[in-house]
Swiss-Prot record:
InterPro entries: Lgt. GO terms for molecular function: phosphatidylglycerol-prolipoprotein diacylglyceryl transferase activity. Keywords: Cell inner membrane, Cell membrane, Membrane, Transferase, Transmembrane, Transmembrane helix. The keyword Cytoplasm does not apply. NCBIfam families: lgt. This is Phosphatidylglycerol--prolipoprotein diacylglyceryl transferase. Belongs to the Lgt family. Catalyzes the transfer of the diacylglyceryl group from phosphatidylglycerol to the sulfhydryl group of the N-terminal cysteine of a prolipoprotein, the first step in the formation of mature lipoproteins. Pathway: Protein modification; lipoprotein biosynthesis (diacylglyceryl transfer). Signal peptide: none annotated. It comes from Chromohalobacter salexigens (strain ATCC BAA-138 / DSM 3043 / CIP 106854 / NCIMB 13768 / 1H11).
Amino acid sequence: MLTYPDIDPVAIALGPFKVHWYGLMYVVGFVGAWWLGRRRADRLGVQPDAIGDLLFYGALGVVLGGRVGYALFYGFERLAADPLWIFQVWDGGMSFHGGLIGVLIAAWLFARKHRLAFFQLTDFVAPLVPLGLGAGRIGNFINHELPGRVTDVPWALVYPGLGPEGRHPSPLYEFALEGVVMFVVLWWVSSRPRRRGMISGLFLLLYAVFRFSVEFVRRPDPQLGFIAFDWLTMGQLLTVPMALAGIALCVWSRRQPVDDARMQAAT
């Protein structure tokens, strides 16, 4: 077994002003997405400066949707007892699935403003999202969040405050799968023009498969436990409609046009 790295969650402290690693990871993800998005802006048919506007929409969607999603999916009883708890962002967490819904709403608003097809925009955004997912999982790891289940694998970590047993470093698994692998696959697939909706469908399907798999070694949320069959978690349940939507999008995309503003400009 390995000892959990002793990393101070506070990256920078200047008097009462503190910057946490978790917050910095969000910044890293957004800045990385902004930089790569500007490099591919011509594919979307917008000016590079518009990517900053897209980032603003996306950031609002992630933060608002992530918090609302966490409250509804993982803390509904507490929300019902104290509706103002949803504003206590330091107490609780963020939900990827809620953040995804928030980003989709933000994408719809941005697409309307810039007169873009909705799935044309989501295909552009999908390869950028793993940067934020991977950075966020590193933030979870530094904060000792999302511990794995007890195991005896050689790389098991002893989590602070959870007893002497070794546990799966589940945030690192998710970093590798949802961050690194998804980015490489989506970036490579999207390097050539694809039919509208195909990249979005592949994103949903990959995330659903990876998240469903990692949930088997990740400790269930204490306030929920297993929600069915003595093994199904809320995270797994929420990935099922994602997988179905991903498959449906990939099938639907076969009848859609190829999206690339550079090709359209040349015709």
